[in-house]
Design a protein with these regions (language model features):
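Basic, helix-initiating cap at the start of DNA-binding domains
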Residues: 1-24, 28-40, 53-54
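Short, charged helix-capping/linker segments at alpha-helix termini
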Residues: 27-28, 144, 148
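Short hydrophobic/aromatic patch on the recognition helix
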Residues: 39-49
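Alpha-helical DNA-contacting segments of helix-turn-helix folds
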Residues: 49, 56-63
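Hydrophobic alpha-helical connector segments
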Residues: 58, 72-99, 150-157
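Short secondary-structure transition hinges
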Residues: 93-132, 143, 152
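Amphipathic C-terminal alpha-helical segment
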Residues: 93-97, 133, 137, 154-176
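Conserved small/polar residues in nucleotide/adenosyl-binding loops
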Residues: 179-181
Length: 181
């Protein structure tokens, strides 16, 4: 139970932070704002994060929350390609409506410069578990070329999505809503 509560507290802090970053901008958001919005304490904030900058690596957590929300809506009768297209589209709709291009650019640059953990590549994320499940089901139905490794399909799809995000940032956010598989 304590682990679940700590995950909820950390999650509330992350969700509140990204909401405020989008509404007020990163520089316009203070730790006090985040603590107030999350309904937590400064002690809780600093228990999980060294400071506001530490939240930059948590966007993958926000993305994973979106994937968790999408899981019950996935139609098991749809093919893998259609399901991948759906989750891709839904994530990008969420990004356009709640993640500023400046923040996404910062996240991608911190991931490029990170010497330690690269959150976007963490194979234990909900994202990768969901991709593996979709690809496995597609392979079982014969939707992919025989001999094509499921892990390679997952890796290629994840790489393609990161490339889209990077290119969207490079282009100033002009076209994300036009991207569909």
């Amino acid at each position: 139970m304590a682990k679940r509560n700590s995950r909820n507290t950390r999650g509330r802090i992350i969700s509140a932070a990204w909401k405020l970053f989008y509404e007020q901008g990163y520089d316009g958001t203070t730790v006090e704002d985040i603590v107030f919005e999350s309904g937590t304490s400064k002690g809780s904030f600093y228990h999980y994060f060294d400071g506001k900058d530490a939240l930059m690596g948590t966007l993958a957590y926000v993305f994973d929350e979106k994937y968790e929300d999408l899981m019950p809506t996935l139609d098991p009768e749809k093919g893998a390609i259609e399901t991948l297209a759906y989750i891709n589209h839904e994530l990008y709709v969420m990004i356009e409506s709640s993640v500023s291009i400046d923040l996404l650019t910062r996240l991608l640059s911190t991931q490029l410069l990170a010497r330690g953990e690269k959150h976007l590549l963490d194979r234990s994320r909900v994202y990768f578990r969901l991709l593996k499940k979709i690809v496995r089901q597609g392979a079982e139905r014969g939707e992919f070329r025989p001999g094509l490794a499921q892990e390679e399909i997952v890796r290629a799809f994840a790489m393609w999505e990161r490339a889209q995000l990077y290119d969207w940032c490079l282009c100033g956010g002009d076209y994300l809503s036009l991207i569909h598989i």
